[in-house]
């Protein structure tokens, strides 16, 4: 599968996507605890808020991507996520601000997932989609592990801002890979109910 340029590019983008999220998320709770005095229950609630954002956004992102294009959604959400990640350490001054930032973060993360998965499956025929998704998930897990491994030493030496900066770089790199190297499948025009009934 990886011998095809577009599939190798999509796989690399999947790796970068999870690496960026890992760099941002892994030390976020510890930073909130150290800098803002956030309690474990407050941090747990923040992740609940983020989960709600994810659940609410995912299906809508899939529908929107069918109308305006999967690549466009992936790129726009990635660039938005890059902005949020860059500003995180500068705008979070209280735990309620962290809730708002994390809510927006998870909206943008969810906006990438469904459209990008659909973009991946459109690259191969039906018989090879399972293999491609398994490969992508494995690379995503590897990317998350690499991000987590880098986050610790960076945090120890330079602080959480270094994690957010490197995470931002990974997210922007993913957007660039998708934008320039991953093809957009043709969108199928929606049929009206009258035409569908006539068929």
Describe each region flagged by the PLM:
Residues 70-116:
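C-terminal transmembrane helical hairpin of 12-TM major facilitator-type secondary transporters
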Residues 123-156:
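A late C-terminal transmembrane helix in Major Facilitator Superfamily
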């Amino acid at each position: 599968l990886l011998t095809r340029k577009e599939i190798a590019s999509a796989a690399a983008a999947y790796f970068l996507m999870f690496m960026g999220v890992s760099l941002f998320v892994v030390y976020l709770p510890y930073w909130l605890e150290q800098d803002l005095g956030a309690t474990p229950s407050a941090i747990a609630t923040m992740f609940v808020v983020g989960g709600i954002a994810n659940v609410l956004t995912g299906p809508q992102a899939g529908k929107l991507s069918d109308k305006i294009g999967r690549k466009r959604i992936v790129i726009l959400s990635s660039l938005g996520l890059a902005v949020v990640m860059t500003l995180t350490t500068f705008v979070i001054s209280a735990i309620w601000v962290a809730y708002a930032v994390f809510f927006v973060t998870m909206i943008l993360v969810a906006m990438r997932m469904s459209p990008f998965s659909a973009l991946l499956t459109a690259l191969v025929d039906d018989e090879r989609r399972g293999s491609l998704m398994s490969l992508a998930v494995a690379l995503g897990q590897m990317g998350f592990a690499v991000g987590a491994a880098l986050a610790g030493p960076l945090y120890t030496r330079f602080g959480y801002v270094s994690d957010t900066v490197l995470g931002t770089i990974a997210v922007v790199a993913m957007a660039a890979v998708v934008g320039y190297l991953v093809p957009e499948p043709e969108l199928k025009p929606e049929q009206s109910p009258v035409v569908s009934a006539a068929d």
